[in-house]
């Protein structure tokens, strides 16, 4: 159960990071709002359900330590600590089972992609030049990548600006259709 709790804790931390924002985080996904908002930042959606799972994970990991210490307390063929071991195991199983159900119904089922942010990340990524390399050549790719880093302009914008590809040709190399 400890291993499951550690993995679930990591997954929930990833959800929290992917949903961070609204302006200074990754903001790639939107979590369902479970509260009116953040007490210190109006309009922000706190990741309360992933945080609940984090807390459950910490409790399960603590219960695992209790089981380990209880096992260590055995003397010869007798372990008087079995009741607390059983209680910790049953509690952990109940916490995980209820937590998974809560996470699925109140969080996972309601997650949406923040398509605008994800699209912007892809189109503004310097890594896009790697996909263009076979089309525009290494020299042009290097030139565009360096200029994009120096100026903050997008790769597609610079390819058009330098007349390396036409807008129509560039659309065929894009991960998704673009209007601009």
What positions do the PLM features span?
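Conserved small/polar residues in nucleotide/adenosyl-binding loops
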Residues: 172-179
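Long, amphipathic alpha-helical stalk/connector segments used for oligomerization, subunit docking
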Residues: 59-122
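Short acidic (Asp/Glu) and glycine-rich catalytic loops that position anionic groups and cofactors
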Residues: 29-37, 69-79, 122-126, 152
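Internal glycine-rich alpha/beta core junctions
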Residues: 1-67
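Hydrophobic alpha-helical scaffolding
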Residues: 1-4, 39-47, 75-89, 93, ...
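Charged substrate- and nucleic-acid-binding regions of tRNA-handling and nucleotidyl-transfer enzymes
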Residues: 143-171
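C-terminal accessory/binding modules appended to enzymatic or scaffolding proteins
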Residues: 129-145
């Amino acid at each position: 159960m400890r291993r499951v709790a550690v993995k679930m804790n990591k997954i929930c931390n990833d959800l929290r990071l992917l949903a961070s924002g609204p302006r200074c985080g990754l903001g790639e996904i939107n979590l369902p709002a479970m509260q009116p908002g953040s007490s210190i930042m109006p309009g922000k959606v706190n990741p309360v359900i992933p945080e609940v799972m984090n807390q459950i994970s910490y409790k399960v990991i603590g219960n695992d330590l209790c089981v380990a210490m209880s096992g260590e307390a055995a003397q010869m063929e007798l372990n008087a600590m079995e009741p607390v071991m059983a209680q910790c195991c049953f509690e952990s199983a109940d916490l995980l089972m209820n937590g998974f159900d809560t996470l699925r119904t109140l969080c996972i089922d309601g997650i949406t992609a923040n398509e605008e942010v994800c699209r912007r990340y892809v189109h503004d990524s310097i890594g896009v030049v790697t996909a263009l390399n076979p089309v525009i050549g290494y020299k042009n790719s290097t030139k565009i990548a360096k200029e994009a880093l120096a100026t903050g302009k997008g790769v597609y914008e610079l390819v058009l600006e330098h007349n390396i590809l036409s807008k129509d040709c560039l659309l065929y190399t894009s991960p998704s259709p673009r209007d601009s």
